[in-house]
């Protein structure tokens, strides 16, 4: 396992992977990993040559600053869980300043009102925050496949729309929900 904290490190590794014509799988997370995340990682390992997990608590997804402040973070535990899946998973866990400038600007996307219903109805601008960070990750990793859980139905529809808006060649792999035993 390699742990990366800088985009420049990731870019070097990704370019090498692309030159070798290997498939890249991406499993974006905000950490605090559980069985659902681990099942996504297993699926990625089964279907891609190189797998990246991201552990990044994205501030632009939070309307309430206390929720952001109180979001559980335990990188040591997360890394131990990832190692149980495979020693060959790369992990990117940047600081906020590595992903955003000081203003934490989000892009505004036309999600065709998908972001205005269900969870989006109560979390203003949440899905623009999701779209912004996923867009940054897709541009950094250039993944062939990105793995998301079907539990996040609205989010998977948003990501699918984002792929169309940005014309990414990434395949969205929606995996069955796995719960803690």
Label each residue range with its predicted role.
Residues 1-181:
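Nucleotidyltransferase catalytic core that binds NTPs
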